[in-house]
A protein has these predicted regions:
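Residue-level signature of catalytic and energy-coupling elements of molecular machines
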Residues: 8, 57, 82, 112, ...
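Residues at helix-coil transition
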Residues: 42, 92, 117, 172, ...
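Conserved helicase NTPase motor core
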Residues: 2-13, 17-21, 52, 79, ...
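The DHp (HisKA) dimerization/phosphotransfer helix of two-component histidine kinases
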Residues: 39, 139, 188-189
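Alpha-helical structural elements of signaling/regulatory helical domains
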Residues: 46, 125, 192-195
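P-loop NTPase Walker
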Residues: 1-101, 198, 217
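ATP-hydrolysis module of ASCE/P-loop NTPase motor domains
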Residues: 75-77, 95-181, 204
Length: 217
């Protein structure tokens, strides 16, 4: 660790309890996370299976895993993933979901179009309208906003509520989930089932999150 500054070393050798590392772009955050993970395994004797490293994109997770394996000179059993991949893994264990349960983008658009046609909506650009509505549905879900208190910028309030409810009903009827459902379902599962929460807390005893400041809740 000779090439690291004092703040980086402090973050790496920290063992138990929460720690937030604030640093700008290019300051070595990925280096700190990978070397801290290595330090937990080699110096503190932590089982690699009990370490979870989360980042926002698949590419970032893959890069971090590769850099860590270079440090360890081989594969290791630390879990690297995105929020969505980790939460979907938890849901798979609880509800036996598979990739077939994840809605495809074209199916999502088709569901919204069904509502447009059923409600006889006249829109100037249907493709843009569908895309915008999908974005608003995602916002409502990911922020866990009460649908009755959300005001759409694309259509009347009662129309948006109707489209939202029909979309959600079609998902459930066809046993499908979207990416925002992964977050919400996992949150609800761990909030309502203390036994399942305790199981995952025991399994992932050390959780390292890259770009933690970008999370919403």
């Amino acid at each position: 660790m000779d090439n690291l500054n004092d703040a980086q070393k402090q973050a790496i050798v920290h063992k138990d309890g929460p720690m937030m590392v604030l640093a700008g772009p290019g300051s070595g955050k990925t280096t700190v996370i990978t070397k801290r993970t290595k330090y937990l395994v080699e110096k503190h004797g932590v089982n690699p299976r009990n370490i979870l490293v989360i980042t926002f994109t698949k590419a970032a997770a893959r890069e971090m895993k590769e850099r860590f394996e270079q440090l360890m000179k081989g594969e290791c059993q630390v879990t690297f993933g995105t929020f969505h991949s980790v939460f979907f893994y938890i849901l798979k264990q609880a509800y036996h979901f598979t990739a077939a349960n994840i809605i495809r983008e074209e199916t999502k658009k088709a569901y919204i179009k069904e509502s447009i046609d059923r409600l006889n909506l006249e829109v100037e650009d249907e493709a843009d309208f569908i895309s915008n509505i999908i974005g608003e549905i995602s916002l409502v879900k990911s922020e866990m906003l009460p649908i009755e208190h959300y005001y759409s910028t694309n259509c009347a309030e009662e129309i948006f509520i109707q489209i939202y409810k029909e979309y959600d009903q079609r998902l459930r009827r066809n046993q499908l989930i979207d990416f925002d459902d992964m977050l919400v379902y996992c949150y609800e599962l761990l909030s309502q089932r203390s036994d399942i929460l305790a199981m995952w807390q025991n399994y992932y005893q050390y959780i390292l999150i890259d770009e933690f400041q970008d999370i919403n809740k």
